[in-house]
UniProtKB/Swiss-Prot annotation:
Residues 101-129 bind DNA. Interacts with sigma-54. InterPro entries: Homeodomain-like_sf, HTH_Fis, P-loop_NTPase, Sigma_54_int. The keyword Magnesium does not apply. Residues 1-46 form the Sigma-54 factor interaction domain. The gene is nifA. It comes from the Bacteria. This is Nif-specific regulatory protein. The keyword Metal-binding does not apply. PROSITE patterns: SIGMA54_INTERACT_4.
Amino acid sequence: EFLLTKIGRQQGRPLTVTDSAIRLLMSHRWPGNVRDVENCLERSAIMSEDGTITRDVVSLTGVDNESPPLAAPLPEVNLADENLDDRERVIAALEQAGWVQAKAARLLGMTPRQIAYRIQTLNIHMRKI
């Protein structure tokens, strides 16, 4: 409502959104923040001839395109495998724990402080998720 009023003021005309357009917007996974929603509404308003944002207009902005498929999850590595070196074992635990150090430490039977030390000494670069 707020964004619609703001965009309408910028364009100098009243804007409305159909129920089907709202449902489409609500069902979309917005990876960014409110600016992504605002940009989509601005593009939709510009493409709307009469100030009514419909599902078809929102679709033209690419909102209903399917998200790219996620990469297949890596198979879990047996952390007790004796063939793994220390670095591989720590990285495998981090991957299984979603790169959360405390969870990886639990998987390896370590304290968070111990795994942090291993990450530093083994020169493992932490992924930002």
